[in-house]
Amino acid sequence: MCAEGRPDETAWGDRIFAGEVSDAYLQRADVQRGYTIVIWRGRHVAEPTELSDDEAARYWLELLRVGRTLEAHLGPVKVNYELLGNSLPHLHTHVMPRYADDPRPGWPFPFPDGEPPPHPEAELRADAEALRRLM
């Protein structure tokens, strides 16, 4: 993640927010509408505990801005914030809107086996543009 810079688009997402210390990418995979990954763009760290208090405060404020914007645009019943890092050791947070009709309400979100299909392009573009405006 450090080496990729701060692109507007990647193979896996469209950037909807470029903050002081983070970028947020709306995911192309059709896992859940609004699924976004917020990536720490300061010095390389793998865990949030490696951030200074000031860095942590700035990251969380930007992360909350993304979450609030997803809530305002999509109206989920809940938003999950997941810091994993098992397969990619760079600080990033999965922001997963949850809806009343999602596959497992009240439980962790079930990720599909294998590569999920892409999100419908027109809906992805419309959501990305709306979220950028709201940021």
Model-based region annotation:
Residues 1-135:
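HIT superfamily nucleotide-processing domains
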